[in-house]
Amino acid sequence: MDSFCLHHYQFSSRLILGTGRYSSPSLAQQSIEASGCEIVTVAVRRFHALHAFTPLINWNRYWLLPNTAGCRTCSEAVRVALLARQLLQHLQQPHQCLIKLEVIPDPLYLLPDPLGTLKAAEILVRKGFAVLPYIYPDPVLALQLEQIGCAAVMPLASPIGSGQGIQHVHSLQLILQNARIPVIIDAGLALPSDASRVMEMGASAVLINSAIALSPSPVSMAHAMKLAVQAGRLAFLAGRMPLSSSAHASSASFGSFL
């Protein structure tokens, strides 16, 4: 499968994993391994919990993508992003500019704040960050974030952790058709078929957490997601057959029987 380029870095896997909601660090580690992912995202507020993963995960094999989950305002997200850069330096991670930006003032539905996200992204881009903003699937906002220099956009498929699957097909299609930066579908994907479908639509990658962590068999689900992402990407590259309003026989209607 072709590689995935994010801020000049190349990745062979188009599946990104979150690390929350697992019943144990060991199960998280096994799921990460089974997924074949290369990027793992961790909330900066949970960096203190990394010590539980340290004996289990070889961080030289994975890119640690910090996120600003839990931030309700622009200023709070900027402060947490700056802290994330310091933490990555302390952990001697080679990439210290990538940040997944989340500004979520709504505690019930966890929908991102478009104005706060745009403002925080502008500040962080000026400070040298490669910003990956988590957004509602708004094509206009996605374009604005691209224009200010974001490294990618991360529109949601449906609310975080809801397992509702793909609820915004048309809006996601508009973003995918017009974006010139990677589009990573984040939040709400519940099944491998969801992951495959957004990859078939042209997504650059997907970020999955709850669908794996809350599965009765997280390791098996992680492997299933890996295969689904690969299948969806191959299908996108191959191209679907043309639509037709009438039926067309796949076998010849004439000739002799053997």
UniProtKB/Swiss-Prot annotation:
GO biological-process terms attached to the record: thiamine diphosphate biosynthetic process
MF annotations from Gene Ontology: thiazole synthase activity
Pathway this chain belongs to: Cofactor biosynthesis; thiamine diphosphate biosynthesis
UniProt xrefs under InterPro entries: Aldolase_TIM, Thiazole_synthase_ThiG, ThiG
Domain of life: Eukaryota
Subcellular location: Plastid, Chloroplast
Catalyzed reactions: [ThiS sulfur-carrier protein]-C-terminal-Gly-aminoethanethioate + 2-iminoacetate + 1-deoxy-D-xylulose 5-phosphate = [ThiS sulfur-carrier protein]-C-terminal Gly-Gly + 2-[(2R,5Z)-2-carboxy-4-methylthiazol-5(2H)-ylidene]ethyl phosphate + 2 H2O + H(+)
GO CC terms of this entry: chloroplast
Keywords from the named record: Chloroplast, Plastid, Schiff base, Thiamine biosynthesis, Transferase
TM stretches of this protein: none
Assembly and interaction partners: Homotetramer. Forms heterodimers with either ThiH or ThiS.
Protein family according to the UniProt entry: Belongs to the ThiG family.
Function: Catalyzes the rearrangement of 1-deoxy-D-xylulose 5-phosphate (DXP) to produce the thiazole phosphate moiety of thiamine. Sulfur is provided by the thiocarboxylate moiety of the carrier protein ThiS. In vitro, sulfur can be provided by H(2)S.
PANTHER family according to UniProt: THIAZOLE SYNTHASE
Name the UniProt record assigns to this protein: Thiazole synthase
Organism: Cyanidioschyzon merolae (strain NIES-3377 / 10D)
